Design a protein with these regions (language model features):
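Exposed beta-strand and adjacent loop surfaces of beta-rich binding modules
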Residues: 79, 90-94, 142-144
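Extracellular and analogous surface-interaction loops
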Residues: 62-64, 69-78, 120-126
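Bacterial N-terminal signal peptides
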Residues: 11-25
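N-terminal secretory signal peptides that target proteins for export/translocation
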Residues: 1-9
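C-terminal edge strands of extracellular/lumenal beta-sandwich accessory domains
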Residues: 30-51, 97, 128-152
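Hydrophobic beta-strand segments within beta-rich accessory/binding domains
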Residues: 69-87, 130-134
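Surface-exposed loop/edge segments in extracytoplasmic proteins
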Residues: 54, 101-108
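Short, surface-exposed beta-strand/strand-loop-strand elements in extracellular ectodomains
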Residues: 89-104
Length: 152
């Protein structure tokens, strides 16, 4: 007798079929963990330059054209990089850093390359800074993103 996921199948079998279908759909769509992997991939060359990547990170999902602000305490005397990534290869993302007065604070070597972006800041003073992440465009309705950072 062939197994099936029809409504007449037993409740355990239907439950198992739904679990498998959900798992397959989830893995096909990607996750914030996948996005974090890409963000960490962006950080690799900077680790060789002496940057220490922090374990904490931010993540979520945004639609095309949406932005999110992340507040972070930065310290004068340190140098920081913020790296953003997404698993959606055809997405275009960005990350920018502003000081507490709303002035752009990032260095000119900040960059955007498709589904990777990075912003570099050397704070002029200790205080709260605002990191603005955005999904500029994406073929997906919602795009997972993750932001990691490092300092030296």
């Amino acid at each position: 007798m062939a197994s099936s996921c029809s409504p007449s199948a037993g409740s355990l079998q239907v439950s198992l079929c739904l679990t498998v279908a959900f798992t397959l759909a989830r893995s096909a769509a990607g996750t914030v963990d996948d996005a974090q992997s890409f963000a960490l991939q962006s950080a690799e060359p900077y680790v060789k330059e002496g940057f220490q990547v922090r374990e904490d990170y931010w993540g979520g999902d945004l639609g095309s054209g949406e932005k999110k602000a992340v507040r972070q305490q930065l310290f004068k005397g340190n140098e920081y990089w913020f790296w953003m990534g997404t698993e959606v290869e055809r997405a275009k993302i960005s990350v920018h850093i502003y000081d507490s007065e709303g002035k752009l604070a990032e260095q000119p070597d900040s960059w955007e390359k498709g589904h990777f972006a990075a912003a570099h800041v050397i704070p002029k003073g200790t205080g709260s800074y605002f990191v603005i992440v955005a999904v500029e465009e994406s073929p997906e309705e919602r795009t997972h993103w993750a932001l990691v950072y490092g300092f030296r």
